[in-house]
Amino acid sequence: MTNIPVSKNRSWIAHLHKGIDQMDGRSKAAIMRPAGVACASDLLSLCEKYLGKKVDSLENLVTGWNLVREGRHLTGRWVIEGSSITGVFSECGCPLVRSGLIELHPVQCYCSQGLMETIFSRAAGKPVQVEIKRSIGRGDEVCEFSIKL
């Protein structure tokens, strides 16, 4: 099998994103959220590695995720405020974007939303709602997410 250059993969995914972007918001989310669900277990494992124990609460998840971000020199953090959790970040948190494997595109934010819904719901023991308030991928200066418990 021939090795395909990263640039070819990046181009192919960019065109896929462009096609998905032609759809309505509900369809975009339906396609991209499952990709984030697939990444949730990887992030949960990282949080547990940095914590040195299983994530068994929202507090542990927030602490672990903030430790992961600090360990990777990423700015911004998660904060628990009553019945919601807010995160404001200065860069896209997607490791595929940060590594250069894919280019940042607005539809990627639905992927992040799926990841957050999965990981926060698991830690909360119930479904949560994730609102994308601002997004670098959509032209804002920061990414801001609100988790409604």
Model-flagged regions — what are they?
Residues 1-107, 128-136, 140, 149:
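N-terminal accessory segment detector
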